[in-house]
Amino acid sequence: MPGDTVTALRELPIEPLTPEAFAAFGTVIPPTDNGVPLGTGDARLDLSQGTPRFYVMRIPGRGFTVTRITRHCKVTQVLASAGGKSWVMGVAPPRAIDDPSTEPDIEEIRAFAIPGDVAVMLHKGTWHIGPLFPEGTQESFFNLELFDTNKVDHQTCDLSARYGLALKLVTA
């Protein structure tokens, strides 16, 4: 991690994804049969702050040691593997989404193994790391956000600069 000032490496266990474990961060969207009516477990999207953008993003694998975490405060974001492969995501609960100086509580960061046949919707302001998968690979992901999310609604906390910390997401 060139340029980073990491003084500590903290292991973060990767947990199995369940709707209950993920509830503070967003909604797990499992496969459902076609024609099933809207239910209480369905994701409630908020795309009201702009024009929605749905696209397939190609991401190089960076491995599982990370120093940055990001959030989007104006939109819910939906992510899913386009190839049906499992992946990993780190998350921290949203806090004070109207305050751009707010940073994540590093003690609340958790990591989840996301099965390839589900999507996740992140609450507005949920801090996230990933999608992550092994270094040297490349994967495609479905992404639903706003057309300008990455330009006007992209707050990143550099864990190495702020806390001297890198997180290594490890199998529990």
Sequence positions of predicted segments:
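A short beta-strand-loop micro-motif that forms or neighbors metal/cofactor-
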Residues: T126-D158
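A short pocket-lining beta-strand/turn micro-motif at the edge of beta-sheets
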Residues: K85-W87, R110, V118, T137-S140
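Conserved metal-binding segment of the jelly-roll/cupin
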Residues: A113-P131
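Non-catalytic, conserved peripheral segments adjacent to functional cores
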Residues: M1-E107, A111, T149-A172
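Generic detection of intrinsically disordered/low-complexity segments and helix-coil linkers/edges
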Residues: P16-P19, M121, W127, E135-G136
